[in-house]
C-alpha cells in the first residue's frame, strides 16, 4: 500500500544551515531564523497591545510626565479648558507653590505629588481619556506609544531569557535527565539543541512574574495576569515559527503514515528510518496559527474589557489541548518516564489546560465575552 502513494509524498531533506556568517565562520540554522522571526513579529504585535492598555489606563505615575517644567508652565499660562480644570482642582496652598515656581528647573517633590494626584483625579472621570491629557499638555506628558515601547523593550528581554532558560531546563529534566546528570556541563550548550516548549512556558511565566515586580515602580496598576495577556497573542504566533523550525530540522517527527500528505524525512534528527510520516510539526503550527487568529480577533473585539488572564487562559486551553491531541501522531520521544500510557508532552500539557480553564471560567468573563463590541 505504501508504494501506491509514493508519488504523492513530499521528500524533505533541506540543509539545516541557512548560511554561514563571514569572518567568524559560524553557521546560522533555519531553526534559529524561524525562532528569531517569531520573536520579532511578536514584538511588533505586543507594542500596540500594551499601547492600548496604557491609553485606557486611568492612572498616571512620574514615568508618564516627560517634562515637569513644561507641565508647570502650561498649568500657569494655558487657557485650555482641561488645563484650567486641573488648575481649579488645586487647593490654595498648591496654587501658591505652583505660582512660586518662577523658573521651574527643580520642582519640589511635594508639588509633583500634588499635581499627579490632581491629574489622576481628573483622569478617573469617565469623560476624560489619557489622550485628552496628552493633547492638552503637549510635550509634557509622555505618549502612550513611547511608554509601550519602553515597556515592550524590557519585557522582550525577560521573555528571551525566560524562554531559553526554561526550555533548556525543561529538556534536561523532563526528557534527558539520565544523560545530563552524567554530563552536567553540557546543560549550558544550548546551541547544540535540546529545548522543551513546556519548560519554555514555565520559564516565561516565571520571567513575567519578575518583570511585573520590576516594572511596578513605573506602572503600579499593571498586574501579572495582565502582562500574561500581553504575551498570549504573540506567543501563539511565535509557536508557529518554532514548529516550522522543527520541520526544517526534521525533529519531533510523526508516526508512519500512508496518507498522500505524508512527508518522507530523509535525515530525521533522532536517527530513525527515513519513511513517510505525519508532518506533525506542521499540524501543530496550523493549530497554533488558528489560536493566534482566534485570540487576535477576540482582542480586536473586546481588548481589555475581559478580566485579566482571559487571553492567557484561552492560549493555554487551545495550544496545549492541540499539543495533547497531536502527541498521538508523534513518534515516541525519550523522556524520564518508563513505559508511560501517555507521552511526557501530554502529561505536561494537562496542568496548563487546567490552569487555562481556571483563568477563563469566571462569571464576568462570559458576560463580557458576549456583550463587548467595537
UniProtKB/Swiss-Prot annotation:
Metabolic or biological pathway: Protein modification; lipoprotein biosynthesis (diacylglyceryl transfer)
Localization of this protein: Cell inner membrane
GO cellular component: a single term: plasma membrane
Membrane topology: Multi-pass membrane protein
A GO MF term: phosphatidylglycerol-prolipoprotein diacylglyceryl transferase activity
TM stretches of this protein: 33-53, 155-175, 195-215, 222-242, 279-299, 306-326, 341-361
Keyword Phosphoprotein: no
EC number: 2.5.1.145
Cross-referenced PROSITE patterns: LGT
Top-level taxon in the UniProt lineage: Bacteria
Alphabetical GO biological process terms: lipoprotein biosynthetic process
Residues annotated for a 1,2-diacyl-sn-glycero-3-phospho-(1'-sn-glycerol) binding in this entry: 243
Keywords annotated in UniProt: Cell inner membrane, Cell membrane, Membrane, Transferase, Transmembrane, Transmembrane helix
Its biological purpose: Catalyzes the transfer of the diacylglyceryl group from phosphatidylglycerol to the sulfhydryl group of the N-terminal cysteine of a prolipoprotein, the first step in the formation of mature lipoproteins.
Family, similarity comment: Belongs to the Lgt family.
PANTHER family attached to this UniProt entry: PHOSPHATIDYLGLYCEROL--PROLIPOPROTEIN DIACYLGLYCERYL TRANSFERASE, PROLIPOPROTEIN DIACYLGLYCERYL TRANSFERASE
Name by which UniProt lists this protein: Phosphatidylglycerol--prolipoprotein diacylglyceryl transferase
Organism ancestry: Bacteria, Pseudomonadati, Chlamydiota, Chlamydiia, Parachlamydiales
Amino acid at each position: 500500500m505504501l508504494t501506491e502513494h509514493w508519488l504523492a509524498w513530499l521528500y524533505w531533506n533541506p540543509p539545516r544551515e541557512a548560511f554561514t556568517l563571514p569572518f567568524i565562520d559560524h553557521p546560522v540554522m533555519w531553526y534559529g531564523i524561524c525562532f528569531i522571526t517569531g520573536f520579532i513579529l511578536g514584538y511588533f504585535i505586543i507594542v500596540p497591545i500594551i499601547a492600548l492598555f496604557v491609553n485606557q489606563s486611568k492612572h498616571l505615575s512620574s514615568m508618564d510626565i516627560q517634562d515637569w517644567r513644561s507641565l508647570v508652565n502650561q498649568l500657569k499660562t494655558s487657557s485650555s479648558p482641561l488645563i484650567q480644570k486641573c488648575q481649579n482642582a488645586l487647593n490654595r496652598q498648591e496654587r501658591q507653590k505652583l505660582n512660586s515656581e518662577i523658573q521651574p528647573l527643580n520642582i519640589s517633590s511635594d508639588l509633583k505629588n500634588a499635581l499627579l494626584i490632581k491629574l489622576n483625579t481628573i483622569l478617573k472621570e469617565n469623560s476624560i481619556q489619557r489622550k485628552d491629557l496628552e493633547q492638552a499638555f503637549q510635550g509634557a506628558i509622555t505618549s502612550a506609544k513611547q511608554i509601550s515601547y519602553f515597556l515592550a523593550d524590557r519585557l522582550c528581554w525577560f521573555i528571551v531569557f525566560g524562554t531559553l532558560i526554561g526550555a533548556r531546563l525543561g529538556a534536561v529534566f523532563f526528557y534527558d535527565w539520565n544523560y545530563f546528570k552524567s554530563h552536567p556541563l553540557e546543560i549550558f550548550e544550548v546551541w547544540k539543541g535540546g529545548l522543551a516548549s513546556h519548560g519554555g512556558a514555565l520559564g516565561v511565566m516565571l520571567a513575567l512574574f519578575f518583570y511585573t515586580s520590576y516594572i511596578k515602580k513605573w506602572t503600579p496598576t499593571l498586574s501579572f495576569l495582565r502582562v500574561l495577556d500581553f504575551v498570549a497573542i504573540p506567543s501563539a504566533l511565535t509557536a508557529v515559527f518554532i514548529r516550522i523550525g522543527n520541520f526544517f530540522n526534521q525533529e519531533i517527527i510523526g508516526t508512519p503514515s500512508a496518507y498522500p500528505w505524508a512527508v518522507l524525512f530523509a535525515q530525521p534528527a533522532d536517527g530513525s528510518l527515513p519513511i513517510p510520516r505525519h508532518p506533525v510539526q506542521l499540524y501543530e503550527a496550523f493549530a497554533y496559527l488558528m489560536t493566534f487568529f482566534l485570540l487576535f480577533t477576540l482582542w480586536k473585539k473586546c481588548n481589555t474589557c475581559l478580566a485579566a488572564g482571559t487571553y492567557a487562559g484561552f492560549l493555554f486551553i487551545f495550544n496545549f489541548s492541540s499539543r495533547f491531541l497531536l502527541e498521538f501522531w508523534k513518534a515516541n520521544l525519550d523522556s524520564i518516564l518508563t513505559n508511560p500510557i501517555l507521552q511526557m508532552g501530554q502529561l505536561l500539557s494537562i496542568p496548563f489546560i487546567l490552569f487555562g480553564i481556571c483563568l477563563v471560567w469566571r462569571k464576568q468573563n462570559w458576560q463580557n465575552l458576549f456583550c463587548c463590541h467595537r
